[in-house]
Amino acid sequence: MPEYRSKTSTHGRNMAGARALWRATGVMETDFGKPIIAVANSFTQFVPGHVHLHNMGQLVAREIEKAGAIAKEFNTIAIDDGIAMGHSGMLYSLPSRDLIADSIEYMVNAHCADALVCISNCDKITPGMLIAAMRLNIPTIFVSGGPMEAGKVIGVANIQPERRLDLIDAMIESADDNISNRQVEEVEQNACPTCGSCSGMFTANSMNCLTEALGLSLPGNGSYLATHVGRKELFLEAGRMIVEITKRYYEQNDETVLPRSIATKKAFENAMTMDIAMGGSTNTILHLLAVANEAGVDFKMADIDRLSRVVPCICKTAPNNHDYYMEDVHRAGGIFAILKELDKAGKLHTDVHTIHAPTLKDAIEKWDVTNPENTHAIERFKAAPGGVRTTQAFSQNRMWKTLDLDREKGCIRDVAHAYSQDGGLAVLFGNIAERGCVVKTAGVDESILKFTGRARVFESQEDAVEGILGNQIVAGDIVIIRYEGPKGGPGMQEMLYPTSYLKSKGLGKACALLTDGRFSGGTSGLSIGHASPEAAEGGAIGLVHEGDTVEIDIPNRSIRLVISDEELAARRAEMEARGSKAWKPENRDRYVSAALRAYGAMATSADKGAVRDVAQIER
């Protein structure tokens, strides 16, 4: 029987000093002996996805205390990728994932907490907390802040009278010379109307949905709007449930509630299957690989490639399809509706267990909104957007009169009526990316699934943006942005501005982009990232010359620099001959702080999840 970790600091004569300090935090005499549950919040006023979380930690804490445990809240950092986008701030985004994981490990282990509630929401916070959960392997539950409502705008030129939109529209239209300043301002003012993670299937929402598929959060976690009063119940339920599973582990020796027991290889395959089916962000591949690595699960790019070939795309939302947003996914039954359709097609391992059900099969049946007997599920997924600008959680209670149960033409479809039989994400291999690169196929127009073009080589995102806005890129070009990987950046910047600007120039279906960096969850188009090995690690993307021909073949999962093996070997030898200047950008002036240099010294390429490899500095 495992012993409560907290006894280390709450029991024994020698811990009198520690108990004195616990008392100073509000712990009463009768509390000693109760489990201590850490509540890791990520509230910040910098991020709309986190601005409403200031009271959420205490909401969970009070419920934990009612259930018979001690709750202690602390905070971790949260970076807004959208605000950090397009300048040097983006260098810090991915490294913050590891900093978040470390900070949670430090707090939980330093204070001997018995269990953990993770209150996350945006891009790197959920992955960072997942890494921490796997590392600590104590009872853990995730509850996120929820998605933002989609924006609405009326009267923008050359479109229907009213449309829904998101921050990506603001980025694209700001660079379109055909749209006036007034029209851009109107989009800007309406794109992000409420608190919450951005309204499409971008990275934040993709990751929060994946916590459901992994079995570490409650149904609705990924889709229940931040503004809806009903979401409050998820926080209260998380508070009650963490006490229950904590006692099951420490008092009944039930190891099935531990993160590593839940997030098995089967669970990772389920999560990736669901991700492919909903056309999630390519960042999810990076993060799932990192989380699996921390969990000690043998889940690799080859597994993702295998799944991507057999899983159809059955849910297609913004940025891949502007007919649907997260609020529509919720109305259609949320993540468990997607899981149900995948299960019907035999695409899931439903014998895995979750924190809230003995098996995934049980959970799918319980939360099936097509079953009229599941009134609790039907009521939860009728939650609708309020349509009022706000930064307040639980501020509206609007409900849909009906759910979207149309599995032929609705938001979520059955496999027979899939948006495409090819999944929403794919892994490509070839001489330019021997260990793979990734593309969100759900966002690629069918006309360019096969594409051959001329390489236009840039050694920084900034230079690429300057080239695109300076009209140096024409139809048929393939923009190569290298030395932007985890080590080469360092920090693996997102390339949302280059892809957005290609669209604003009318080149969204006429050009491709390949990088060893990564993309925002808001990216669509023929945007291929995570080229591994990265240029700074000796990857062949560093050997591409201006004007080379590159062939992309998504149906056959290949990408190729059209030169002979002998020529490629000669270029590699020439590069190696540069000595200390080899595998470094030739003409880039970029300040890199000590913190970023430390990350870059340990960073691995994207095919390994861009995790830190301490051995690289120990050698």
Swiss-Prot record:
<comment type="pathway">
    <text>Amino-acid biosynthesis; L-valine biosynthesis; L-valine from pyruvate: step 3/4.</text>
</comment>
<dbReference type="GO" id="GO:0005829">
    <property type="term" value="C:cytosol"/>
</dbReference>
<feature type="binding site">
    <location>
        <position position="81"/>
    </location>
    <ligand>
        <name>Mg(2+)</name>
    </ligand>
</feature>
<comment type="similarity">
    <text>Belongs to the IlvD/Edd family.</text>
</comment>
<feature type="binding site">
    <location>
        <position position="494"/>
    </location>
    <ligand>
        <name>Mg(2+)</name>
    </ligand>
</feature>
<keyword id="KW-0100">Branched-chain amino acid biosynthesis</keyword>
<dbReference type="GO" id="GO:0004160">
    <property type="term" value="F:dihydroxy-acid dehydratase activity"/>
</dbReference>
<dbReference type="Pfam" id="PF00920">
    <property type="entry name" value="ILVD_EDD_N"/>
</dbReference>
<dbReference type="Pfam" id="PF24877">
    <property type="entry name" value="ILV_EDD_C"/>
</dbReference>
<comment type="pathway">
    <text>Amino-acid biosynthesis; L-isoleucine biosynthesis; L-isoleucine from 2-oxobutanoate: step 3/4.</text>
</comment>
<dbReference type="InterPro" id="IPR042096">
    <property type="entry name" value="Dihydro-acid_dehy_C"/>
</dbReference>
<feature type="binding site">
    <location>
        <position position="122"/>
    </location>
    <ligand>
        <name>[2Fe-2S] cluster</name>
    </ligand>
</feature>
<dbReference type="InterPro" id="IPR004404">
    <property type="entry name" value="DihydroxyA_deHydtase"/>
</dbReference>
<dbReference type="InterPro" id="IPR037237">
    <property type="entry name" value="IlvD/EDD_N"/>
</dbReference>
<comment type="subunit">
    <text>Homodimer.</text>
</comment>
<protein>
    <recommendedName>
        <fullName>Dihydroxy-acid dehydratase</fullName>
        <ecNumber>4.2.1.9</ecNumber>
    </recommendedName>
</protein>
<feature type="binding site" description="via carbamate group">
    <location>
        <position position="124"/>
    </location>
    <ligand>
        <name>Mg(2+)</name>
    </ligand>
</feature>
<keyword id="KW-0408">Iron</keyword>
<keyword id="KW-0001">2Fe-2S</keyword>
<feature type="binding site">
    <location>
        <position position="123"/>
    </location>
    <ligand>
        <name>Mg(2+)</name>
    </ligand>
</feature>
<keyword id="KW-0028">Amino-acid biosynthesis</keyword>
<feature type="active site" description="Proton acceptor">
    <location>
        <position position="520"/>
    </location>
</feature>
<keyword id="KW-0479">Metal-binding</keyword>
<keyword id="KW-0460">Magnesium</keyword>
<dbReference type="InterPro" id="IPR020558">
    <property type="entry name" value="DiOHA_6PGluconate_deHydtase_CS"/>
</dbReference>
<feature type="binding site">
    <location>
        <position position="198"/>
    </location>
    <ligand>
        <name>[2Fe-2S] cluster</name>
    </ligand>
</feature>
<keyword id="KW-0456">Lyase</keyword>
<dbReference type="GO" id="GO:0009097">
    <property type="term" value="P:isoleucine biosynthetic process"/>
</dbReference>
<dbReference type="GO" id="GO:0051537">
    <property type="term" value="F:2 iron, 2 sulfur cluster binding"/>
</dbReference>
<feature type="modified residue" description="N6-carboxylysine">
    <location>
        <position position="124"/>
    </location>
</feature>
<dbReference type="InterPro" id="IPR000581">
    <property type="entry name" value="ILV_EDD_N"/>
</dbReference>
<dbReference type="InterPro" id="IPR056740">
    <property type="entry name" value="ILV_EDD_C"/>
</dbReference>
<dbReference type="GO" id="GO:0000287">
    <property type="term" value="F:magnesium ion binding"/>
</dbReference>
<dbReference type="GO" id="GO:0009099">
    <property type="term" value="P:L-valine biosynthetic process"/>
</dbReference>
<comment type="function">
    <text>Functions in the biosynthesis of branched-chain amino acids. Catalyzes the dehydration of (2R,3R)-2,3-dihydroxy-3-methylpentanoate (2,3-dihydroxy-3-methylvalerate) into 2-oxo-3-methylpentanoate (2-oxo-3-methylvalerate) and of (2R)-2,3-dihydroxy-3-methylbutanoate (2,3-dihydroxyisovalerate) into 2-oxo-3-methylbutanoate (2-oxoisovalerate), the penultimate precursor to L-isoleucine and L-valine, respectively.</text>
</comment>
<keyword id="KW-0411">Iron-sulfur</keyword>
